[in-house]
């Protein structure tokens, strides 16, 4: 526990110290910044804000985790677990980096196409499964305390879980500070679970990423001086999925990650309802003012028809939802 605290402090300090230099370099080189959605007019002023800040906190968290674990952890099984989780973080970070690179440096607005991104994510998920999950012999998922054996279909579950949550966190990263603190809340919850399970290797990884993310948040809160980009959001989502698998508490991510589930569900429901009503009535109709859900809140509060919410209000609401959901999971696991 003490080692994790030290690693978290080091990660925070290095991340917070390094980020201003990254931002300054970005600005000096006049690199194109984040593009904003025209439908949310209050965001247009952010156009050109440096992005890809996830590169910094991912490098910091990975480096600190590796250095501390190599010098302090002698158990080969623990080192294998750490390397497994870090591998999926790095792989998805590279996918996100490539997507950001194409958008910003090559001026390709969509970056990777949806098919290209999905293919790379599936390839990364397969590598994670065959190199780190399959050798462990795990083929069942924990469903509210009951082990559901999936056999060979566990492979498809892992792919769905990792790809799904990486994209879900990516959708959540739409306003200042929302994704970074939402992930911190999720990681703190998994840190408690890892501590109770005596999984101090996983706890070390969690601590270093929390520290690095908080260092990043110093420059990502409103008004944001930097965004994490796909390099950060895709990697963080994959990390949460991998941690839930490593701790054998897969089901908990549906509740701990309720914000990501809500954001993704809003997009899926909007698309389905729009297509359905267009086919039935000849015109597409919407459930939400705009998706993902955080934009709906910005444009008209919970009802979508009320007063506009500020980014801080949206952040506070969704952080609160995430915190309550996380407390519910801990209560289910250790109280009830």
UniProtKB/Swiss-Prot annotation:
- Protein name according to UniProt: Phospho-N-acetylmuramoyl-pentapeptide-transferase
BP term (GO), one: regulation of cell shape
Catalysed reaction equations from the record: UDP-N-acetyl-alpha-D-muramoyl-L-alanyl-gamma-D-glutamyl-L-lysyl-D-alanyl-D-alanine + di-trans,octa-cis-undecaprenyl phosphate = Mur2Ac(oyl-L-Ala-gamma-D-Glu-L-Lys-D-Ala-D-Ala)-di-trans,octa-cis-undecaprenyl diphosphate + UMP
According to its UniProt record, in which pathway does this protein act? Cell wall biogenesis; peptidoglycan biosynthesis
The source's domain of life comes to Bacteria
The species is: Streptococcus pyogenes serotype M18 (strain MGAS8232)
Q: Does the keyword Transmembrane helix apply?
A: yes
- Taxonomic lineage of this organism? Bacteria, Bacillati, Bacillota, Bacilli, Lactobacillales
Q: Tell me the membrane topology, using the record's own terms.
A: Multi-pass membrane protein
Q: For this UniProt entry, what's an example GO CC term?
A: plasma membrane
Keyword annotations for this protein, in alphabetical order, are:
Cell cycle, Cell division, Cell membrane, Cell shape, Cell wall biogenesis/degradation, Magnesium, Membrane, Metal-binding, Peptidoglycan synthesis, Transferase, Transmembrane, Transmembrane helix
Q: Which GO MF terms does the UniProt record name?
A: metal ion binding; phospho-N-acetylmuramoyl-pentapeptide-transferase activity
User: What top-tier enzyme class does this entry carry?
Assistant: transferase
**Is the keyword Cell wall biogenesis/degradation in the record?**
yes
- Purpose of the protein: Catalyzes the initial step of the lipid cycle reactions in the biosynthesis of the cell wall peptidoglycan: transfers peptidoglycan precursor phospho-MurNAc-pentapeptide from UDP-MurNAc-pentapeptide onto the lipid carrier undecaprenyl phosphate, yielding undecaprenyl-pyrophosphoryl-MurNAc-pentapeptide, known as lipid I.
